[in-house]
Amino acid sequence: MKASIFFVAMAVGVAGNLPEWPQFGGPNRNFIVDSKGLADAWPTGGPKKLWMRPLGEGYSEISVDQGTLYTMYRKGEQEVAIAMDAATGKTRWEYAYNASFGNMAMENGPGPHTTPLILGNRVYTVGILAILNCFDKTTGKLLWSKDLYKDFPGATRMDRGYSSSPIAYKNSIILTIGGAGHAVVALDPADGHLLWAKNDFGNSPGSPTLINVAGQDQLVAFLNEGGPAAQGLIAGLDPNNGALLWTHPHKTSWGLNIALPVWGDDGILVMSSAYGSGARALKLTREGGKTTVKELWANNRMRVHHSTMVRVGEFIYASSGDFGPAPLTAIDVRTGEIKWQERVFPKASFVYADGKFFVVDEDGGVSLATLSPAGAKVISKVSLLEHNAWTAPTLVGTKLYVRDRKSIAALEVGR
């Protein structure tokens, strides 16, 4: 897949194996991995539990590299970046720092929300107050730290804390911040100094992604025009310098979006949001150095809140719904036609590998399923976690890593 090019390009002077799950969404930032040897069904009691341990508040995904897991959690008034042995769950190192939640909205927990980024021998984390920390991934030594809200005055402060996971491109780390002149910024991974800052949009809780349009790398992000009646939009930028290449309207209530956009090799980009907008598909083409954006369809019945969207073939699968029921939905990326909607799980996130979906629903169920245009089939299911289990699972080889707001666990899902 073309997306794999980006992670190869961003390795900063490091040879050898790349991280197995280096960032939000996995190697290609699309919740699809190339794992083989996965079981076609689980025993009655569920897959073998390798270990389970207490962790703490937070929705950070679990990043993985060379037998070590990296994530974040909250302990009282502190945020904690933690590294754990993938085989045992034992702590290898952790780093705690003060991060008062203050007057931010607490009803869904205090975060942290972002996923650690692994790059070479370093790991990068961002907390609810937009503190970007760089650690030696082996020792946990803090190498440098940046207060993004302080460094970029007027940056968008989200009601539930900063939640946009960073992405790496070539020799830079790119973050959406919001604000005049610095809607999107790029920093040097070595020391955090500013490489570029561009554009005048507001930020949202969602994370950016990288695509390639006819040979040109582009950063895609959901941004907004700010103000009390924020108007959301999808933006394409040059990740080399932040230059704005194109925008397309995608209005949502409060100018918010959380779900990661989905890109296909056919040039179709799909963005789906809760908060009133639904899903929208854009066909991107490029000629004469200019990108042309054509809206293919819009469908308000596909409203993905904070869960994952996964494209397999010509269909995208995701839970559609805001704060009520969220039926599992299959939508044709070419036409916007809803093929089916079924209440198979509560609101759920998943990762796809070897023809199977590994599902974590918000009530704590962990499932093995097959999804196709013909419908959904739950093969196996076990109750393991507690509500709200909103973190997407991580799959590395035949090991599935899952968490909720109290615990983290490792499961063996191989044959």
Model-inferred region functions:
Residues 6-16:
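Hydrophobic h-region of N-terminal signal peptides that target proteins for export
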